[in-house]
């Protein structure tokens, strides 16, 4: 039986033309990762990049073309070597430059360099939940909303 609660780990994160990162790659060690730097250094951008390795529009709900580096050709990519319940895998997502064979607004997703139909497939390898200051209503609002949120999170952990 597979343990669906196995912790996911990101061993390497690579960003290409993502927000303020023209090209960046970081290798991580250990279970806890702390991002430290001055305001505007790109800490939140790195977290947002990781959030694109899940279904949806990412942590900030940005449009796909909004996250491209202003100095680039309109394309961007995020990839990560991860370890989770299914072992090691490389997840990648991004968009191609306008004028390439795929429309620029078409997000491509890959697992181990093989195309997958959507980012939902990433959930088999990397599970994440994020809470942002804009979600304060979750804690200040009705208890029924909190229960619904946590029920969804628990349900995802046992899929």
Residue ranges, per PLM feature:
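Conserved small/polar residues in nucleotide/adenosyl-binding loops
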Residues: 157-159
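Nucleotide-state sensing region of NTPase/ATPase domains
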Residues: 54-145, 150-151
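Pre-Walker A-like glycine/lysine-rich segment at the N-terminus of P-loop NTPase domains
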Residues: 1-52
